[in-house]
Amino acid sequence: MLTCQRKRESLSKGIAGKNATRSLAILGLFAAPWVGFLAVALKPSPRQMWSQRWPTITFVGLYQLALDRCVEIFGLEHLPRTGPVILAGNHINKTACDAMLMGSKILVERGSLAKFVSQPNPPDRMLKHFLRLMGNADGVILPIQKGLTTETMIKFLRNPEAFGRQQPILGIFPAGSADGDFEAQMNRPWHTGVAVAACESGAPVVPFYIEGLPYHWGPFDLLKAASRSLVGSRAFDFKIHLGPPIVPGPGQTNYAEVTERIRHGVLQLAG
């Protein structure tokens, strides 16, 4: 009983501390809006964030002020603190807002800026513009290039310094496109690129299962959700579940088998 009470008290103090920090940050914005916002955005990892383009800086700042309270992560202990890591799991949002939220949460919790593999030609004109801005070497997006994507993934995992990183964390959606139907996404063929990158680089694959974000939401929906979160309760409840790392054996070349192990890991997390 006493242990449970202490845990509850510790959790309450942690939440109170986060809320106090958030309130101070908001007050700072009133005093010096642009300087205050930039300070908030750069805080998780000043060196990495300073090299980012304005859409990334803006989103990370907004995330810390209003959206972090809408995102929960479970199993963070499974994410290695050093060395290359691949995150692989389900994809639930057609404009990759799930990747943006997941990357921001890991940045806030660990100080590492993840890079997510992305489709090269999104249908929306604004998203295409963002992709061009954030798809550079230091950016948070690794655009798919026919015949070159897996090679670039391996380079990122082996030589993070060339991409402005200390620890390379690569996010991949092996099913490809997003789908609101989890079962359908699990049953369709998965790309083996994640397995190839893991086997070639020696990086462990941490499976993830995400839930709680509408399929159709775009950046403007997140902006509206942020405004609601600033003045009231959480606008949505996005949950990230991380599983134990999957490590390919030495000399492993059966990429289909490794891919199935990853798929099974995601299914286990989904329950």
Name each model-derived stretch.
Residues Q64-A256:
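Soluble catalytic domains of membrane acyltransferases
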Residues K13-A16, L27, V35, T82, ...:
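Feature targets compositionally biased, intrinsically disordered low-complexity regions
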Residues E260-G271:
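Short, cationic low-complexity segments
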Residues R6-R8, L223, G271:
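Intrinsic low-complexity, intrinsically disordered segments enriched in polar/basic residues
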Residues G17-A20, A39, H78, T150, ...:
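Polar low-complexity intrinsically disordered regions enriched in Ser/Thr and small residues
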Residues T58-F59, L127, V194, I262:
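Generic structural signal for hydrophobic residues
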Residues T3-Q64:
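N-terminal membrane-anchoring alpha-helices
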